[in-house]
């Protein structure tokens, strides 16, 4: 893979920073009404590219493919609300965190059984494949269905096909602002 200095020189020589993100996780990275990629991670990565004197080029990918693409050299960086874990830190370099996410548990309004993470034992959730949300749900005894987007998760929850889901509190709040029903 080369040293960090070699990678930086290659990025600057190419004139572009290839940034991987999901593009489907509001408010972090998503498409607005005009189908323009926007969001907090988009703004952060634009600022990084500007500081490097290059243009950002975005590649949208499912969560479970982000690290594989980085490993294969298809991307220069992932800018997608990645939680720093001991296991990931063995392989990847991280910036100082630019955002902190609190994990929230969401259930249907008519669900009185699940109030805490401990109540997930024996229940079904849906979460992004290979995410820390998936790992957390499994650690509390939930059966987890792997999916690609928060939108899909909410649809499964609304249809009663899962009992609960875990995700960033800010993502749930943002979703509820856009979809108050």
Predicted feature residues:
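Extracytoplasmic small-molecule ligand-binding "clamshell" domains
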Residues: 2-81
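Alpha-to-beta junction loops
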Residues: 17-18, 53-55, 71-80, 123-124, ...
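Short secondary-structure boundary segments
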Residues: 23, 82-83, 109, 129, ...
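Ligand-binding cleft/hinge of the Venus flytrap
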Residues: 29-34, 45-54, 117, 130-149, ...
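Short helix-initiation/N-cap motifs at beta->coil->alpha
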Residues: 58-68, 112, 130-131, 145-159
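A ligand-binding cleft/hinge motif common to bilobed small-molecule-binding domains
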Residues: 65, 82-91, 136-139, 163-181
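Short Pro/Gly-enriched coil loops immediately N-terminal to beta-strands
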Residues: 92-104, 149
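Flexible hinge/capping segments at coil-to-helix
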Residues: 108-124
């Amino acid at each position: 893979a080369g040293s960090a200095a070699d990678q930086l020189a290659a990025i600057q020589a190419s004139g572009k920073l290839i940034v991987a993100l999901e593009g489907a996780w509001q408010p972090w990275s998503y498409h607005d009404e005009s189908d323009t990629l926007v969001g907090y991670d988009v703004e952060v990565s634009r600022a990084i590219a500007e500081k490097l004197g290059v243009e950002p080029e975005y590649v949208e990918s499912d969560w479970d493919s982000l690290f594989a693409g980085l490993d294969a050299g298809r991307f220069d960086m992932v800018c997608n609300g990645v939680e720093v874990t001991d296991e990931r830190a063995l392989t990847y370099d991280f910036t100082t965190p630019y955002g902190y996410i609190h994990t929230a548990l969401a259930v249907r309004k008519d669900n009185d059984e699940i109030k805490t993470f401990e109540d997930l034992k024996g229940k079904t959730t849906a979460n992004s494949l290979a995410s820390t949300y998936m790992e957390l749900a499994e650690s509390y005894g939930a059966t987890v269905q792997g999916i690609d987007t928060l939108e899909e998760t909410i649809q499964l929850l609304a249809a009663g096909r899962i009992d609960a889901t875990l995700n960033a509190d800010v993502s749930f709040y943002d979703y509820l602002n856009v979809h108050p029903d």
